[in-house]
Amino acid sequence: ADALKMLTKEDITPTGADKFIYNLAPVIAFATVILMWAVVPFTPLHIGADVGIGVLYFMAVASIGTVKIMVAGWSSNNKYALLGAFRTIAQLLSYEVPLVLSLLIPVMLAGTMSLQGITEAQGGMWYLFIAPVAAFLFYVANLAETGRAPFDLLEAESEIIAGYNIEYSGFKWGMFM
């Protein structure tokens, strides 16, 4: 019901916004999510794309998220959106390093950067039990990257409501969520 309500809301573009880039930012946000799912092996037979460097591809596409945030904050021509973008990017970049380091453990254990190869290498025992510290670090870094509690400062309702996407509404706002 909430999704339907969001899709039917009026889509407003701010007066001083760079309209092309303002409209491009939600598309970049949605495209990065779809591109990340392309290399995830669901079953041995259902793989979008089995690239040999799946982990590197996954992290590179995830890093594009900082670009979409900066574009969204800057293109709306709102100083609060820009400040929210700066704050969000600072948080995302600070947790990027632990996320990459925790992903290196399964890569080293499996001897491959292919997500399919890493999945197959865990046939006997999951790496969660072999490297619990790396698994916990990956979990915490992912909480921070996705903005879940206790790292939900990205929208900081007590400071700047909605952060970088303060000017977005309707369908465009939904593409960020």
For each feature predicted by the language model, list its residue ranges.
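Selective transmembrane helix interface/packing segments
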Residues: 1-177
